[in-house]
């Protein structure tokens, strides 16, 4: 099979075709079943986190080590030349690219990953999150988890709850699932944090069903995937936040009418939008979802850095 991902920048989930997504998911499953500890031996990968991260950074680093590659970089953007000495992002990337085979970047500025790709001397860039814009590798692990639990990525009813305006994970996930046939979307959020129009317009253009709902109870019996996200306190005034906090919290009692196959996902961190008692239900899948990040990131790293795969 031709590997069209070889040397490709992974900036946005929209840059990947459906067949490329399927290639990554198949490779993820293979690596989960059969580890390949020397697949990226002698490769050096830079991990450049200009913004704080725990799960994404550690997941990437674990994936790199388990493939036999080496890693260099930083996890605190405040202590590098760009901040201390006023060096530009583009100069930083240009220099780092001369040391390594690929660069992973997280940056608070939207569009920063695509800008970095213009100055990386053709070394592949992996976007680990650029502001409220995109988070493609999170989407890959989300798709992998959905496929594992539902045995398909088509004909799914997906509810997405929480901060749909600023949540980069929900934008990427909706765009990715829109590439697969006959999926339906249910959006549940405060009015101030509803899904951006460009996402809704994209679904309309593709004639994909979507609808806004006021609470989780309305749709719990209809859905296959419940994708929860946290509502950030700083996004709302105190009254709106208090209302949202009570209205958009998932409690175990709400799950009594859920389908047997339904699974709850969350990009984490979870604050108080999922009660702890939900953790003990068969629907809770967010910690297994996080663990799948290693395999999805191993898959995309190896496909981009190695042309031929068995």
Curated annotation (Swiss-Prot):
Keywords for the protein's UniProt record, in alphabetical order: Pyrimidine biosynthesis, Transferase
Residues at which L-aspartate binds: 85, 168, 230
Domain of life according to the entry: Bacteria
Entry GO terms, CC: cytosol
GO process annotations (BP): 'de novo' pyrimidine nucleobase biosynthetic process; 'de novo' UMP biosynthetic process; amino acid metabolic process
Pfam family, one: OTCace
Enzyme Commission number: 2.1.3.2
Keyword Coiled coil: no
Pathway: Pyrimidine metabolism; UMP biosynthesis via de novo pathway; (S)-dihydroorotate from bicarbonate: step 2/3
Disulfide partners: none
Protein family membership: Belongs to the aspartate/ornithine carbamoyltransferase superfamily. ATCase family.
Subunit comment: Heterododecamer (2C3:3R2) of six catalytic PyrB chains organized as two trimers (C3), and six regulatory PyrI chains organized as three dimers (R2).
Function per UniProt: Catalyzes the condensation of carbamoyl phosphate and aspartate to form carbamoyl aspartate and inorganic phosphate, the committed step in the de novo pyrimidine nucleotide biosynthesis pathway.
Protein name (record): Aspartate carbamoyltransferase catalytic subunit
Organism of provenance: Buchnera aphidicola subsp. Acyrthosiphon pisum (strain APS) (Acyrthosiphon pisum symbiotic bacterium)
Classification of source organism: Bacteria, Pseudomonadati, Pseudomonadota, Gammaproteobacteria, Enterobacterales
